[in-house]
Each structure stands twice: as C-alpha cells, then as structure tokens.
C-alpha cells in the first residue's frame, strides 16, 4: 500500500513540481521523525498528502502540449506504464531493457516527427508535437525517424517484419489503426484517451481527510 502510494506521489510531484525541490528535504525529515517510535503508515501518508497537488493540477499537467519538452524521462515512464497496463501477463515486455552499448532498447517516438518534411504532414500538428497524444514507444526509432505518417505506420524491417506504428506490437498505438493521416485533433483525442487510462490508477482519493491523523 505504501509503495503504491509513494509511486503515485512521486509521479504527481514530477508532473506538477509540487512540492518544490527546496521543500523536499524538510518534508522527508519530518515524515521520518514520525516513524521513530512506531511505524504508522497512515500518519506517514498524511504528511505527504498535505503537500501534494490536487488532482486537477495533475490532469492539467498531462494535458500540457509541452509535456515531453518539460520532462522527457517522466514521459517515458508514463508511456511504459500505459503500455504495460494494456498487456496480459503472457505478453509482457521488458521496456526498461538496455542494449550492449548501455542504451535503452525502447525509446520515445514522436508520431508527428520533430523534424518533419512539411509537405507530408498537416501544418497544425506542430502545435501538439510534445503532447502525450503524439508520443509512443518504439524499439525502431531510426527506422521510423522523420518519415511520413503512412510510411511510419507500415514500415518493415530488413526481414519483412512489420515494425511500424500499425504493426500491433505496441498496444498504445491501437488508436492509430484506422488512421490514414495525422492531425492536431488526433493528437488531442489520443491524449485524452491515454490520460483516462493513466488516471484510473494515478489519481489520489480526494475524499480522504488525514488532518486528524497529523494533528
């Protein structure tokens, strides 16, 4: 229970930057002192909860069109969480694996690329470049790169295997299956879809009042 709470707490903290970095040492010391005589999980959570952002701010952060630009490492964590949540136990993949050069095998891919050929993409896509809905995971970043949407969707490897965005290998790409092109509306709609999946497990229970526990 505590570990699950701490995972949510740090996720929310990184999304909203609340509490601020200069508050963390004091906060953690205060929380630790409450546990010196006896372990009290509820009291520990209460202290952390009082400093945490409201759910509205967490939602606002996920809606940001600069989400990746603001914290690319956090976005990678969110995408991996989303992908793993869509898989059965038999289909789990180690998305944290590294290659023999010490680099991550799976990386964040911009569906609308960071350096697009402008004649191959809708002009309004650039407004959602770093939004959640324009981001996915791939183990073939160099194969996708700055290609058009159609080519990124259907690209194959040297052995003829499907590795594109519509290959079905990445579950969070299911939204793309019936898409022939990609625009800002698609980015917004996919952002909403992914956010809803994420928040099922990452929203805090605002109905819980810990004040009596702390005082």
Could you say what each language-model-derived stretch is?
Residues 1-215:
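Flexible coil/loop and intrinsically disordered segments
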